[in-house]
Swiss-Prot record:
Keywords: Cytoplasm, Membrane
Membrane topology, as annotated: Peripheral membrane protein
InterPro entries from the UniProt entry: PH-like_dom_sf, PH_domain, PHLA1/2/3
PANTHER family per record: PLECKSTRIN HOMOLOGY-LIKE DOMAIN FAMILY A MEMBER 2 (PTHR15478:SF8), PLECKSTRIN HOMOLOGY-LIKE DOMAIN, PQ-RICH PROTEIN (PTHR15478)
Annotated family: Belongs to the PHLDA2 family.
PROSITE patterns for the chain: PH_DOMAIN
Domain PH stretches: 9-103
Subcellular location per the Swiss-Prot or TrEMBL entry: Cytoplasm; Membrane
The name this protein goes by in its record: Pleckstrin homology-like domain family A member 2
Domain free text: The PH domain binds phosphoinositides with a broad specificity. It may compete with the PH domain of some other proteins, thereby interfering with their binding to phosphatidylinositol 4,5-bisphosphate (PIP2) and phosphatidylinositol 3,4,5-trisphosphate (PIP3).
Disulfide bonds listed in the record: none
Length: 136
């Protein structure tokens, strides 16, 4: 990923996040999903960011349960931490949008890696050709 990549907002709205403490209450959070991260705010004005989950640190999105009232899902990070969320109904479908954003991010990263590898190979070939042209 290059510094010139611009994060575009894919989805914005409310999610409920299960707290990490012993009582595990559900707390409503304002969330903004971009092409690079899921930003979680403690307030609706988005002044106080409580967490930023970079897509590169997310391993997968698991849909745990779908009840009549909520869709429950878990984000699993690359260090195997599980963060539980729920959204009010299927129309919100945050889990699907996050999963698609994750796949798109991984595809962009793979393409960038492939391009970098090809550029490196082409540079190496060019250097070899110049060396061979100088040889007696």
């Amino acid at each position: 990923m290059t510094g010139s990549d611009i994060s575009h907002i894919l989805k914005e709205g409310e999610l409920e996040k299960r707290s990490d403490n012993l009582l595990q209450f559900w707390k409503r959070k304002t969330c903004v999903l971009t092409t690079d991260s899921l930003n979680i705010y403690t307030d609706q004005q988005k002044k106080n960011k409580s967490k930023e989950l970079k897509l590169q640190s997310i391993k997968k999105v698991d849909c745990v349960e779908h009840t009549g009232k909520f869709v429950y899902f878990t984000i699993v990070t690359t260090d195997n931490k599980e963060i539980d969320f729920r959204c009010s109904d299927e129309k919100n479908c945050w889990n699907a949008v996050i999963a698609i954003a994750l796949v798109n991010f991984q595809n962009r990263k793979a393409i960038q890696g492939f391009k970098t590898q090809k550029e490196s190979e082409n540079t190496s070939l060019g250097q070899q050709e110049r060396c061979m042209a100088r040889a007696p």
